[in-house]
């Protein structure tokens, strides 16, 4: 099996994104492992298997190579089920907001033959920002229920080795904001806001 090894560990200062500011941010291999673990906690299963490994004297993330026929939204035939394909994109938005991946672009969204996303490149993520940078109005049921069950203790237990305190707090704050959107959709009776996953 082919895999991608990433050992980047860089810290930058004075980062801003869509009007929010942070004193620092990290581009880190640890985010790759944290994203995989969080993806599995939610039951999304869109991040390829990713583990911590040491290669050539360097510690980093090792991620299974994702072979997918579609690498861009414009490639290949249109999806057989456009509604399902749209739901897949909303699931990716849901995940990207929670981990606050500001590096998601068309070149690192891989799509399977059924248009299911394969999320790669999470090293620039887990910023402490809160403001959604893409509309959040449709939600995957199973992952939402998993998110409702998750608490600070569980997140720290599973992700604490790879995330710093402010990164975990940012994740918890975004969880609260997203679940508030979910509660509002339920209160308004918007059943079309939820899709099976």
Predicted regions and their residues:
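Conserved ATP-binding subdomain of kinase catalytic cores across diverse folds
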Residues: 1-80, 93-101, 113
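C-terminal catalytic region of ATP-dependent kinase domains
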Residues: 24, 112-197
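Soluble non-cytosolic domains of exported or imported proteins
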Residues: 26-30, 83-84, 88, 165
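Low-complexity, flexible helical/coil segments
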Residues: 41, 84-85, 98-100, 146, ...
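Glycine-rich loops and low-complexity Gly/Arg-rich segments
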Residues: 72-75, 86-88, 142-146
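A short secondary-structure junction signal
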Residues: 73-77, 104-109, 130-131
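Short intrinsically disordered coil segments
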Residues: 76-82, 134-139
């Amino acid at each position: 099996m082919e895999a991608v090894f990433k050992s980047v560990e860089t810290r930058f200062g004075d980062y801003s994104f869509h009007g929010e500011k942070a004193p620092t941010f990290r581009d880190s291999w640890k985010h790759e492992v944290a994203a995989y673990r969080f993806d599995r906690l939610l039951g999304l299963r869109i991040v390829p298997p990713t583990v911590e490994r040491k290669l050539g004297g360097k510690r980093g993330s090792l991620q299974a190579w994702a072979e997918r026929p579609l690498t861009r939204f414009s490639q290949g035939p249109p999806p057989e089920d456009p509604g399902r394909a749209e739901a897949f994109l909303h699931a990716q938005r849901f995940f990207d907001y929670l981990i606050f991946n500001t590096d998601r672009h068309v070149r690192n969204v891989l799509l399977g033959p059924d248009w299911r996303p394969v999320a790669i490149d999470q090293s620039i993520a887990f910023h402490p920002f809160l403001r959604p940078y893409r509309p959040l109005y449709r939600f995957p049921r199973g992952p939402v229920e998993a998110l409702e069950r998750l608490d600070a203790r569980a997140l720290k237990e599973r992700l604490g080795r790879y995330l710093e305190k402010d990164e975990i707090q940012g994740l918890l704050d975004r969880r609260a904001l997203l679940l508030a959107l979910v509660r509002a959709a339920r209160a308004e009776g918007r059943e079309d806001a939820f899709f099976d996953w």
